[in-house]
Amino acid sequence: MTRIRRGYIARRRRTKIRLFASSFRGAHSRLTRTITQQKIRALVSAHRDRDRQKINFRRLWITRINAAIRERGVCYSYSRLINDLYKRQLLLNRKILAQIAISNRNCLYMISNEIIKEVSWKESTG
């Protein structure tokens, strides 16, 4: 059987993989087999950490909102604020509330006070 030379197709495939791993250290940027393994591992980690990043930012926003709310009143907390927001049907997400808590605390206090007044008034009237 005659030998078939792969030519430029295999070389092009390998150079494309090598360009991806050019910033890796040691054999991870030189040997084709380890480059492909590290590429798969890097893409898996990137996919996992994109979801993880969303979770971490949500936790950070919740912590910031809770810290700002509890600073004002001991009896009021993050969970009650979010519950009252849903009762009033206000569309303020956690990211926006965290930005308000950092940049303008008085605005957040005004929002929470209005919500407390409205909810307590509705509960007292029946």
Curated annotation (Swiss-Prot):
Q: What is this protein called?
A: Large ribosomal subunit protein bL20c
Q: Which Gene3D superfamilies match?
A: 6.10.160.10, Ribosomal protein L20
- Name the protein family: Belongs to the bacterial ribosomal protein bL20 family.
InterPro entries found in the cross-reference section: Ribosomal_bL20, RIBOSOMAL_L20_CS, Ribosomal_protein_bL20_C
Protein's cellular compartments: Plastid, Chloroplast
Membrane-crossing segments per the record = none
Alphabetized GO MF terms: rRNA binding; structural constituent of ribosome
| Biological processes per GO annotation | ribosomal large subunit assembly; translation
Q: Which domain of life is it from?
A: Eukaryota
Which keywords does UniProt give here?
Chloroplast, Plastid, Ribonucleoprotein, Ribosomal protein, RNA-binding, rRNA-binding
Lineage runs:
Eukaryota, Viridiplantae, Streptophyta, Embryophyta, Tracheophyta
Q: What is its main location?
A: plastid
Functionally, this protein is described as follows: Binds directly to 23S ribosomal RNA and is necessary for the in vitro assembly process of the 50S ribosomal subunit. It is not involved in the protein synthesizing functions of that subunit.
Identify the coding gene. rpl20
Keyword check for Ribonucleoprotein, yes or no.
Answer: yes
Q: Which GO terms describe its cellular component?
A: chloroplast; ribonucleoprotein complex; ribosome
